[in-house]
């Protein structure tokens, strides 16, 4: 592959404020690829996190507007970041994938299901990304106040 980005699925693991510039910089290389957004726009106030809503309603929708030739899917918002830094350790969580392209969502969920102890769920269109991005503030607040590393686990499914 002559392009610097050769993968069919690319995870953009940057902060919310870096996501737009990253998308603009790599837009041509990301054309036709599944792009995974895992950014949350949050602000910490003492022992609490609060969500910040971007103009498009979610970071994922903002990324899709910038990467209109790619298929943006949002996922991993509720998996504690420390879990990704210690991949050799037990990581148990449910991951909700939201995106407007059914095939892109399915592709990402298939990848997620290859990771032991992660379950993937179809969260519908990119409109639902705002729920995953903003719920991260609640989950982080719980983790800080209770001194835990909790993630999302859906029951009854």
Walk through the language-model features, giving the residues of each:
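Short, well-ordered coil/turn elements that cap or connect secondary structure elements
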Residues: 30, 67, 90, 115-117
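Rossmann-like NAD(P)(H) cofactor-binding subdomain of soluble oxidoreductases
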Residues: 12, 16-80
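Short, glycine/charged-enriched secondary-structure capping and boundary segments
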Residues: 24-28, 49-52, 86-90, 110-112, ...
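Short beta-strand and adjoining strand-loop segment in the mid-core
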Residues: 48-56, 86-103
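Short, flexible, solvent-exposed loop/turn segments with mixed acidic/basic and small polar residues
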Residues: 42, 82-89
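Short, small-residue-biased leader/transition segments that mark boundaries at the very start
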Residues: 1-3
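An anion/phosphate-binding loop that grips the pyrophosphate of nucleotide cofactors and donors
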Residues: 6-8
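Active-site-lining helix/loop region of Rossmann-like oxidoreductase modules
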Residues: 93-157
């Amino acid at each position: 592959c002559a392009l610097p980005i050769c993968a069919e699925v690319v995870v953009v693991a940057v902060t919310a404020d870096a996501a737009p510039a990253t998308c603009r910089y790599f837009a041509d290389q990301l054309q036709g690829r599944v792009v995974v957004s895992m950014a949350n726009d949050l602000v910490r106030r003492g022992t609490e996190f609060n969500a910040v809503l971007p103009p498009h309603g979610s970071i994922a929708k903002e990324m899709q507007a910038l990467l209109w030739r790619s298929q943006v899917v949002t996922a991993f918002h509720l998996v504690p970041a420390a879990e990704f830094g210690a991949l050799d350790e037990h990581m148990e969580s449910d991951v909700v994938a939201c995106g407007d392209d059914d095939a892109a969502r399915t592709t990402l969920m298939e990848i997620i299901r290859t990771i032991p102890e992660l379950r993937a769920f179809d969260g519908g269109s990119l409109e639902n990304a705002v729920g995953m991005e903003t719920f991260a503030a609640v989950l982080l607040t719980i983790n800080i106040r209770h001194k835990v590393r909790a993630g999302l686990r859906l029951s009854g499914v």
